[in-house]
């Protein structure tokens, strides 16, 4: 959505 890892989903999640 807005996070840096929205594509992979391994950074922080959808939006943090």
UniProtKB/Swiss-Prot annotation:
Protein origin, superkingdom: Eukaryota
Biological process GO terms, please?
Answer: neuropeptide signaling pathway
Q: Tell me which stretches of the chain form a coiled coil.
A: none
* Broad class of the protein's primary localization: secreted
- GO molecular function terms noted in the UniProt entry: neuropeptide hormone activity
Subcellular location(s) of the protein: Secreted
Which of UniProt's keywords are assigned here? Amidation, Neuropeptide, Secreted
Modified positions (Leucine amide) are 16
Annotated Gene Ontology cellular components are:
extracellular region
**Any keyword Secreted?**
yes
Family statement drawn from the similarity comment of this UniProt entry:
Belongs to the pyrokinin family.
| Record's function text | Myoactive.
Q: Under which name does UniProt file this protein?
A: Pyrokinin-5
Taxonomy, top ranks, is: Eukaryota, Metazoa, Ecdysozoa, Arthropoda, Hexapoda
